[in-house]
Regions:
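Core segments of small alpha/beta cavity-forming domains
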Residues: 5-8, 20-21
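Short, well-ordered alpha-helical segments enriched in acidic and aromatic residues
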Residues: 16-29
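A short gly/proline-enriched turn/hairpin at secondary-structure junctions
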Residues: 31-40
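Hydrophobic/anchoring residues in structured secondary elements
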Residues: 32, 65-67, 105
Length: 107
């Protein structure tokens, strides 16, 4: 499956637990919605993913990717140290100039 470079980096940096490199996938004003919370800007996003990486040690296995213009959805099998692992989640991206402007994680 062919993925945009930023989505490949998003997956790779999560696999190696590099929260700083993960945050670099996002624009300065990016917004992330996950687990009922909103995270605004690179600094908050880096703190969110650092906590998530430490708590869940999750890995993503891409199952499907659909794109329409700047909007796309990655469906992935997510495994890690959390109840119900593995689960299938959808990552709804809005990509702008090769960086993620908006991400919403849903089941």
């Amino acid at each position: 499956m062919e993925l945009p470079q930023v989505v490949e980096r998003f997956i790779e940096t999560q696999h190696i637990f590099d929260s700083k490199a993960f945050a670099e996938c996002f624009t300065e004003s990016a917004i992330v919605h996950d687990e009922g919370k909103t995270h605004n800007g690179k600094e908050e996003i880096q703190q969110w993913i650092k906590h998530s990486m430490e708590a869940y040690k999750s890995a993503l296995e891409p199952l499907n990717y659909q794109q329409s213009g700047s909007k796309s959805v990655l469906t992935a099998n997510v495994s890690g140290m959390f109840p119900g692992s593995p689960i299938v989640l959808k990552f709804h991206f809005d990509i702008n100039n090769g960086q993620i402007q908006h991400l919403k994680v849903t089941d």
